[in-house]
Amino acid sequence: MVRFESTDSLMLARQLPNKTVALILAGGRGSRLKDLTATRAKPAVHFGGKFRIIDFALSNCLNSGVRRIGVITQYQSHTLVQHIQRGWSFLNEEMNEFVDLLPAQQRLSTEQWYKGTADAVCQNLDIIRRYDAEYIVILAGDHIYKMDYSRMLLDHVEKGAECTVACIPVPISEGSEFGIMEVTADYQITAFYEKPANPPPIPGDPSNALASMGIYIFNADYLFKLLEEDNNTPGSSHDFGKDIIPQLTARKVVWAHPFDLSCVTSNAELPPYWRDVGTLDAYWRANLDLASVTPELDMYDRAWPIRTHMEPLPPAKFVQDRSGSHGMTMNSLVSGGCIVSGSVVVHSVLFPRVRVNSFCTIDSSLLLPDVHVGRSCRLRRCIIDRACHIPEGMVIGENADEDSARFYRSEGGVVLVTRDMLAKLEAK
């Protein structure tokens, strides 16, 4: 393990991002989000009133000084590509800064789509090699968090690792949903299990397991060698978590990086924030948490801004209707272009250009862009997908049986409403 003096570490931390390329894996479908990802990839799903999920990984790269980024796409990529072209085209190519879109193109002789996360990178090796980077940061494009990758890069170099995996403790009951690792006292990974049925607990902490965050740093030449080996291995699923990382443990070249060392937070009293919003319930909770008095994720931190495509929209407006009832909101996020007329919005998130007509009550709900709510509606614990028109007088979220028959109701009782569901209901 290489040790640097503090001044050397500071200089190195500033230099490493310039020697690095980030690859964001953004081709996932996100099937557990049900119909919310029927027409868009999970990284393109709306979040937090005005953002897309992928904006967090992209913003982390820029804020960390990593300004060479490749975005690997596959499933339903049009919305994602459009968002990146509109909102992330400001980098300076003359300064060797870019966000490069890498769609699935059946590059290899097998003429197949990406078979796994490692294969997605492998099929783009000819492009990635031309980036001429010393280090490759591989990121999932579908997680919500703020992280300084330069700190993880420094940890990677100081330990002399060939590969470093970011990790975070998760409840042992949820361990089967993640890649779980066992580590030594100095965080060398000795074993790695992808979604094990019986995850091993952290020594001394039987209630938690140490989970992979799906964030990897590789020395570039070593990664290229690994991917070529894996591509020629019969029976491999060509996945980082299932194939690449487990085999590195025997070689003693892979280390874990605790997330709390590089987590960006404006409140040291709060635990490190990282969310895999892979289910409707998790997605709903993470959005509504932003509307709380003290959210776990600080979106107002000017030192670590989350960037996105900014539409030229007017401010939100709350007006009284003809009867004199005032539009009002409490503990909610309301985005630009919204109009609330003579209705009450409580603990909800209204995305851009939402229109709520008179005599409505919106409670604990997410209304995605361009939703139109007719008069006298009651919506509770709902996710209303983009451009839905809720008919006058409709009640959602108060009768579980009715909701399940008309829409999709999650295990946690959150109701997802889409345009197709409304069209089928209207056709009956």
From Swiss-Prot:
CDD domains, alphabetized: ADP_Glucose_PP, LbH_G1P_AT_C
BP GO annotations: glycogen biosynthetic process
Keyword Zinc: no
Gene Ontology MF terms in the entry: ATP binding; glucose-1-phosphate adenylyltransferase activity
Keyword list, A-Z: ATP-binding, Carbohydrate metabolism, Glycogen biosynthesis, Glycogen metabolism, Nucleotide-binding, Nucleotidyltransferase, Transferase
Domain of life where this protein originates: Bacteria
Record EC number: 2.7.7.27
Top-level enzyme category: transferase
Pathway of action: Glycan biosynthesis; glycogen biosynthesis
Binding residue positions for alpha-D-glucose 1-phosphate: Y114, G179, E194, K195, S212
A matching Pfam family: NTP_transferase
Entries under InterPro entries matching the protein: ADP-Glc_PPase, ADP_Glu_pyroP_CS, GlgC_bac, GlmU/GlgC-like_hexapep, NTP_transferase_dom, Nucleotide-diphossugar_trans, Trimer_LpxA-like_sf
Keyword ATP-binding: yes
Catalysed reactions, semicolon-separated: alpha-D-glucose 1-phosphate + ATP + H(+) = ADP-alpha-D-glucose + diphosphate
NCBIfam families: glgC, PRK00725.1, PRK00844.1
Physiological role: Involved in the biosynthesis of ADP-glucose, a building block required for the elongation reactions to produce glycogen. Catalyzes the reaction between ATP and alpha-D-glucose 1-phosphate (G1P) to produce pyrophosphate and ADP-Glc.
UniProt record similarity statement: Belongs to the bacterial/plant glucose-1-phosphate adenylyltransferase family.
SUBUNIT field: Homotetramer.
Protein name: Glucose-1-phosphate adenylyltransferase
Organism, scientific name: Yersinia pseudotuberculosis serotype O:1b (strain IP 31758)
Lineage, top ranks: Bacteria, Pseudomonadati, Pseudomonadota, Gammaproteobacteria, Enterobacterales
Protein encoded by which gene: glgC
